[in-house]
Amino acid sequence: MAKKEGKHNIGAGIVRALMYPFAKMPLRWHYFFAGFIAWLLRAVLHYRQDVIYTNLAKSFPDKSYAWIRKTAGDFYRHLAEMIVEAIWFSGCRNPERLRKARIVELVNPELIQEAYENSPSVMVLDTHCGNWELLGGLFFYNFKDCECPIKPGVLHVVYKALKNKTWDKVFYENRRSPTPDKEGQIEASGMLRFIASHRREKYIYLVNNDQFPRESSCEVGTFLNQPTTGFVGAATLASRLKLSVLYMGMVNDRRGHYSIRFERICDDASLMTPEEITRRYYDLLEKDIKETPHNWLWSHKRWKNIK
């Protein structure tokens, strides 16, 4: 086991070393390469083309094929920009580089501050909108003149480990680039144990909640015109521990800039069922997707249980 772990660490080190020269380039140079990557994904590799087109067509049955095709193209461009932004982010060992680029801004940090002050802990339900690979810099995205509780030692991000251990190590270290000496990531399989054992401590938990659920699921109802099951584990924990629950939306409002907005789902999750919390989350997510359709991860097999 130790030998395999060492092999993965070496592989991850090689990948990150190859990324390093590109990571130090100015962000605007990365967007120059993004155009080529988008073309490569769409026109040459046809990356998950069937999944993307099928998801879009079923989610927007009233739209024309021309609209589906354009939105798919916009998504490929967005995906390419996410890739180059993640590479650039790996070079942000100096948080000032993040703040100077102002690539992400918190629109209403006062809402999460209020929730944090008035709740045992806060459960923030995230999505696959925007660029979640930039969330390792959340501590540095508040440009408003108000207090924000998103700080190292307070924020704990729940993530799902990749099957490929080398790439899992690459992304794990990448997300920690601005704060490499700080811990704060929880693997999804250990979420229940960690939160239960730290229930007397005040934390903010960030959970990406819109993937296809393999366990702890419920029937959400109709989401994007399709019957959908949703992951309910985070909502169940929040309900049992009487946590405040927020939705976190991330919008790519222009190239090189994302806005993060929090919306209150409930102040005390014990007053709602986990199913009600999850339904409200999906209502907010659907609203965001309809406003900026290309901004979601259409290449994900979200409805793999539907024939």
Spans of features found by a protein language model:
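Short, flexible loop segments at the rims of nucleotide/cofactor-binding pockets, characterized by
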Residues: 98-104, 180-186, 223-225
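Short glycine-/small-residue-rich flexible loop motifs, especially phosphate/cofactor-binding loops
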Residues: 53-54, 136, 172, 218, ...
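Non-catalytic C-terminal accessory region of glycerolipid acyltransferases
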Residues: 2-6, 141, 177, 188-307
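Catalytic core of membrane glycerolipid acyltransferases/transacylases, capturing the structured
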Residues: 118-188, 215-217
